[in-house]
């Protein structure tokens, strides 16, 4: 039973090529169209969303943030949001439900922040290990706690996104598997529940991409 449930997350292969991962890059096919087509209402709405995110990330980074650094986090948000939504369509591989992708996004970002901070702002990074007002007797323990909490950050970022994507898809799969054994009346309620769950999954897709980008921005602001 569990094998069948999780089989929707298995990347299949054709001619020894894992073609499912190509769904991650489908968004690249849509980017060139904005340069030669007249902007539609959807483009205007999307541009306003990106502008709002730019202002928010710039506020989170503070005055010490480098110019243009917000585009990294906006691109990260766009990539995760696109793949989260693509995973909601039938027969499209959900790449963000795999730690292979989420950890590949979180770990290099965290490593870059840490290397930049410890090389250029060493004293500032040491000061982060001991919160202000900590009693002297607790300082060694706080250093250990802060170090561990810092090390697990990329893991928590990746697992949070992966777990949220898997949970919703598993619920949809469970409900879908019960359909053939139900009466027509119960199938109506089942479809209503699945539509409601799909709407909730759309909200989760947006929220999780936003959370991933915001937390990455906050981690970046700590090393400046």
UniProtKB/Swiss-Prot annotation:
Altering residue 187 to I: what's the impact?
In strain: HW09
Gene3D superfamilies the UniProt entry points to: ATP synthase, F0 complex, subunit A
> What keywords are assigned to this protein?
ATP synthesis, CF(0), Hydrogen ion transport, Ion transport, Membrane, Mitochondrion, Mitochondrion inner membrane, Transmembrane, Transmembrane helix, Transport
Q: Where in the cell is it found?
A: Mitochondrion inner membrane
A GO cellular component annotated for this chain's UniProt record is: mitochondrial inner membrane
Keyword field contains Cytoplasm: no
Q: How does it sit in the membrane?
A: Multi-pass membrane protein
Example of a GO MF term: proton-transporting ATP synthase activity, rotational mechanism
Q: What is its main location?
A: mitochondrion
Chain's role = Mitochondrial membrane ATP synthase (F(1)F(0) ATP synthase or Complex V) produces ATP from ADP in the presence of a proton gradient across the membrane which is generated by electron transport complexes of the respiratory chain. F-type ATPases consist of two structural domains, F(1) - containing the extramembraneous catalytic core and F(0) - containing the membrane proton channel, linked together by a central stalk and a peripheral stalk. During catalysis, ATP synthesis in the catalytic domain of F(1) is coupled via a rotary mechanism of the central stalk subunits to proton translocation.
Q: State how it assembles.
A: F-type ATPases have 2 components, CF(1) - the catalytic core - and CF(0) - the membrane proton channel. CF(1) has five subunits: alpha(3), beta(3), gamma(1), delta(1), epsilon(1). CF(0) has three main subunits: a, b and c.
Entry similarity comment: Belongs to the ATPase A chain family.
By its UniProt entry, which NCBIfam families does this protein fall under? Answer: ATP_synt_6_or_A
* Record-given protein name: ATP synthase subunit a
Native species: Drosophila simulans
